[in-house]
Amino acid sequence: MSEEKKSVELSGDIDFIETPPAKASQFETGEDCGIEVTKAAAIPNPPLAVDGPGNESFSNYLLGGTLVGLPAFLTWFFGGGAKTFVFFFLLSVLPVLVAFWTYASTFSPRTNEKVKLPGRPVEHYITFKREEDKAKWHGKNKIPMQTFAEMYLDGLVDFNGDTLDVMEYRHDWANFSFTWDLFKFIVGTFFVDVLFHTKAQDEEQVRPNYDSGNDHYAWFLGPRMIYTSGIISDPEKEETLEEMQDNKMAIVCEKIGLKEGETMLDIGCGWGTLARFASLNYGAKVTGLTIAENQTAWGNDALRKAGIPEEQSKILCMDYRDAPRTKFDKITQLEMGEHVGIRRLTGFFRQCYDMLKDDGAMYVQLSGLRQAWQYEDFIWGLYLNKYIFRGADASTPLWYYVKCLEQAGFEVKGIDTVGVHYSGTLWRWYRNWVGNVEAIKAKYGPRWYRIWELFLAWSVIASRQGSATCYQMVVVKNLNSTHRINGVASQFGLAGALAASRAAGKSRLP
């Protein structure tokens, strides 16, 4: 083994912890919050499920009228013509957008007033380090969430308790106004990333993220090393993270009707756990693709340790655009499409179409955003784009994914929405991360720890409340010759797919 490979942490180099138990809340009032509160064991139940301001009060007509009306007025005032209008329009479009979104996000009312906020002062939840910040945000004067996030990463403010617990009460101490720093990131970084998504750009942005260290990911993903949503099988039971991930892999294999000896391509395979599961439990011949060298080393090492020969299954370090141009019985891609980019999504699906046998099936799992957005959704999403998933921009409402798949030549066979399952998964990731706090800070520093701590805690909430969700889609080629009747037996929802895998004794990774 080369010296370079020796420096990569493999499964035997990691001491995995058992997911710590959830902490009791310090902030519960015991009073009626105005709506029913759930008591499921599978997720952290929200104490204040507040519907914040968003598209319910946002007027596209008013925005459009302002964008056109201001340059029209200036053109009339100065006695100009069409060229003058174009000049003033180009001059004013960005300031108008910034001013409009700032005003709307600051002064729009909540979508509804059902939830009663405790009304505690800001300092009950968070503690500022600088006197000027204490003077600026105190009592009922709430801090913009984006400003708070940046200050928290810089160590200028602390939570007065467990991060997730305090974030559950964020509507009592923060607002969701768009800030100048947020606009600078959108214009100067986010839009630039969205425009291109070249291979070189993706390697520059994606590879350092997933090659940041296998130990970094192991500290929250646990022994399965799966960076996608698990599945809850029983809301009244707190399944382990490993059980939830096994549930998901079993469902994937059943939904595509995977059979022994079939070839399967897993695009964006991560650390290769699905490839190992499908190889061991279903006898498939799997090729996994990842752009990350550390993931490739881990995945192949785990396959060999499980007794799976390279002739059967392997992980390749390769950009999806360089995928082997051969035909596969089944294709899977779990939450890698976000890195493809909105502009390239249909072309990517068409590439998959060309690599899939005519009677094959493809499983697509993608994160999504709701059409009925709230301002918090954008602020959370841009935090993720800046610090966690740089360049990942293809999280959209469901209709856009369906359109891209159909334009690529596919027919949608089935769809499940699993956002709340993601919340349960993230809850366990968050507890793992907090449980490894000392090791993380010792190697990566306190800022790195805080970036991911806030991401995981906030995402637990975002996926539970609908800010973000996740879709499982199974598609087949939309050809007259596609034997659709053969797919009826595998046309499962979540419960049916998992039951079929359990009945066959294939639902747990050995």
UniProtKB/Swiss-Prot annotation:
SUPFAM superfamilies with a match to the protein in the record: S-adenosyl-L-methionine-dependent methyltransferases
Compartments reported by the entry: Membrane
Pfam families recorded: CMAS
Carbohydrate-modified residues: 55, 175, 294
GO CC terms, sorted: membrane
Keywords linked to the UniProt accession: Glycoprotein, Lipid biosynthesis, Lipid metabolism, Membrane, Methyltransferase, S-adenosyl-L-methionine, Sphingolipid metabolism, Transferase, Transmembrane, Transmembrane helix
Class of this enzyme: transferase
Keyword Transcription regulation: no
InterPro entries: SAM-dependent_MTases_sf, Sphingo_C9-MT
The keyword Hydrolase appears for this protein: no
The protein's Enzyme Commission number: 2.1.1.317
UniProt-annotated binding residues for S-adenosyl-L-methionine: 227-228, 264-272, 290-295, 320-321
Chief place of localization: membrane
Entry's family note: Belongs to the CFA/CMAS family.
Record pathway: Lipid metabolism; sphingolipid metabolism
Disrupted gene: phenotype observed: Leads to increased resistance to cell-wall-damaging agents, such as calcofluor white (CFW) and Congo red (CR). Accumulates unmethylated glucosylceramides.
Source species: Emericella nidulans (strain FGSC A4 / ATCC 38163 / CBS 112.46 / NRRL 194 / M139) (Aspergillus nidulans)
GO terms for MF: methyltransferase activity
Protein name per UniProt: Sphingolipid C9-methyltransferase B
GO biological process, one term: glucosylceramide biosynthetic process
Its membrane topology: Multi-pass membrane protein
Catalytic activity: a (4E,8E)-4-sphinga-4,8-dienine ceramide + S-adenosyl-L-methionine = a 9-methyl-(4E,8E)-sphinga-4,8-dienine ceramide + S-adenosyl-L-homocysteine + H(+)
Sequence intervals crossing the membrane: 62-82, 84-104
Function: Catalyzes methylation of the sphingoid base component of glucosylceramides (GluCers) at the C9-position. Sphingolipid C9-methylation requires 4,8-desaturated ceramides as substrates. Glucosylceramides play important roles in growth, differentiation and pathogenicity. The methyl group at the C9-position distinguishes fungal glucosylceramides from those of plants and animals and may thus play a role in host-pathogen interactions enabling the host to recognize the fungal attack and initiate specific defense responses.
